[in-house]
């Protein structure tokens, strides 16, 4: 039992060589049928037929493999876009456009800004602050996020506008890759202020 090696499906002989085996069996069937019917086939034409069958089989295999690689690359790209949307853009947009404020919201924003910056686009990285400095204003009907300095407020206002533009670009790319009809949301009002 110590030397038992478990074979993955992709490594199995049948899974790997099945298309080639099918083509060889079809070729053998064609040759056998020709011999049984006592057709006169010159050895050159058998070689030419075998070469043509193998070439067409190789072409079909290449086309199918290429299509599978394209589909896998598309799925990987869709997954990367979903991660960008779900882990970066959507949480930040919700945090700055929702009246819902919890004690964890500030920590979530700080975590997104510091730890998930790699998910942001280049334009946003140029204007996105390294940390989230604000003063929580809990007065009903006022903005959730009130900034101490006017410079911070202006920087965040610009960063949120760039965030929204990049979000729309990423969302359009996602819709295009997934083949879904493009339906873009309206830009929210940013709940930020300056005192």
UniProtKB/Swiss-Prot annotation:
Subcellular location(s) per record: Cell membrane
Transmembrane segments: 13-32, 42-64
Predominant place of localization: membrane
Membrane topology designation: Multi-pass membrane protein
Swiss-Prot/TrEMBL keywords: Cell membrane, Membrane, Transmembrane, Transmembrane helix
Gene source species: Archaeoglobus fulgidus (strain ATCC 49558 / DSM 4304 / JCM 9628 / NBRC 100126 / VC-16)
Gene3D superfamilies from the UniProt entry: AF_0924 domain (1.10.3940.10)
GO cellular component, one term: plasma membrane
Protein name per UniProt: Uncharacterized protein AF_0924
KW Cell cycle (keyword) present: no
InterPro entries the UniProt entry points to: AF_0924
């Amino acid at each position: 039992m110590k030397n038992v090696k478990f074979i993955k499906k992709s490594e199995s002989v049948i899974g790997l060589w099945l298309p080639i085996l099918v083509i060889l069996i079809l070729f053998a069937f064609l040759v056998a049928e020709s011999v049984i019917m006592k057709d006169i086939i010159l050895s050159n034409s058998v070689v030419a037929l075998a070469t043509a069958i193998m070439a067409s089989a190789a072409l079909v295999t290449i086309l199918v493999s290429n299509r599978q690689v394209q589909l896998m690359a598309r799925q990987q790209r869709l997954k990367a876009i979903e991660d960008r949307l779900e882990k970066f853009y959507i949480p930040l947009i919700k945090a700055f456009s929702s009246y819902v404020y919890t004690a964890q919201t500030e920590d979530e924003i700080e975590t997104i800004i510091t730890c998930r910056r790699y998910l942001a686009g280049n334009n946003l990285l140029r204007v996105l602050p390294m940390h989230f400095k604000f003063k929580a204003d809990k007065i009903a009907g006022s903005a959730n996020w009130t900034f101490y300095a006017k410079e911070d407020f202006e920087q965040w206002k610009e960063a949120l506008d760039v965030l929204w533009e990049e979000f729309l670009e990423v969302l359009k790319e996602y819709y295009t890759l997934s083949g879904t009809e493009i339906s873009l949301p309206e830009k929210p009002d940013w709940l930020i202020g300056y005192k």
